[in-house]
């Protein structure tokens, strides 16, 4: 099953003096802003301060994670880090979210295979599960292990359930595979 497909991921962290995302009570309270504008490649902006006030040392600053979905070795992935950071700042300026003088510092992280894709041979993944479920001491978990779009909480629950199976000598891994199967949770394309 070498043909399972993934999207890769680049996140640029930018520490800012200000950002044009305010409500009457200060910065907006959203954790993520999904970007749909066709003239930029940004997929999502995470406002790290909103996850926890302890995530940013200087309470007068805003730290954002600007996210890009890409493929390893494509145009975005292949950019030099300094060029990519400049590109990201330029995109944030195109969105009228920041000005050059707002930027204090930045960093970049690239993650291969961050997002499992439900394309290609994904419809044959059950063969992997059937094979690996027979290996008593092997428990698949997380996005890459299960080739499933699990969030951190789902991955942690899978790990806890795997530990429970081990501790109780339970060979049935169904409880692990049932994590993140709630239909109301998933984002699906609606038919109009």
Predicted segments, located by residue:
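Mid-domain catalytic core of redox enzymes
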Residues: 1-82, 86-97, 174-184
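Short Gly/Pro-enriched loop/turn and capping motifs at secondary-structure junctions
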Residues: 71-73, 113-114, 145-147
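C-terminal lid/capping helical subdomain adjacent to the catalytic/cofactor pocket in oxidative enzymes
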Residues: 109, 118-192
